[in-house]
Amino acid sequence: MLAADFAYLAEEVRKTQLGGAEFVHFDVMDNHLVPNLTIGPAVAASLVRATDLPVDVHLQVSDPASLIRPFAEAGVSSITVQPGITRHLHRVVSEIRELGCEAGAVLTPATGPEEIAWILPHLDYVVVMSVELGFGGQGFIEGMVEKVRRVGEVCSLPVEVDGGITASTAPLMVEAGARALVAGSAVFRGDPTEEMRRIIEAGRSAVRRASGG
C-alpha cells in the first residue's frame, strides 16, 4: 500500500480487492533503518477494520522487537522481520507466532538463503526482496529470480516476492516458485482494479504454462 493514495486508503484497498488481491501488504519504515517514514499501528488497526483481507506487515525498522505486540494487537495477520537487523531473532519470531500472527523473514538482494537456514523451522514463510529496502517504485532486480529458485531448493515454506512486480515480472517469479507477490507502484499507476487483474492474470498464465494447460 506504499504507493496508494493515503487520503483514500480504505477505498484503494477495496479497488485492489475487486481486482483479485488476496491480502494487503504495507511497509513500516522508521526513518532510521531506511531513509523513509511511513505508518504505525494506529493506521494498521484502521486498515484491518476497513477490509476483510489479511494484512501483511514488513517491519523495516531498527528495533522491530518493540513493534511486534502493537502491530499484533492492531489485528494484522502476518509480520515480517529482517534477520540481519533483528536482535534475538528466534525470540522475536516466537513472539510473533505466540501473538497469533504468521512470522516471516526477509532476504534482501544482498542476503543469501543460507543465512536464514537455522530459523526456517520457526517461520511460516520467506520474503525475497526484488528491490532494495526503503522506497517504492524501484526497478526489478532480475537476479532475484534465481534466488527464489534457491530458496525453494532449501525449504518448503511459501515464498513471497516483494518489489518491482508488474505484469511482465510476475510470471518470472511464479515460474521460479513464488507463492505470493507484492505489487505496489504497478497497481496504483492507473486504475487499481484493472492493474491488479492484469498482474494476477499474468501470474496465472505462467502457472497454466508450467502445468501444460
Residue ranges with predicted function:
Residues 97-100, 105-108, 179, 184:
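Amphipathic, soluble alpha/beta structural segments
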Residues 125-133, 137-180, 186-187:
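Active-site/ligand-binding-proximal alpha/beta "capping" segment
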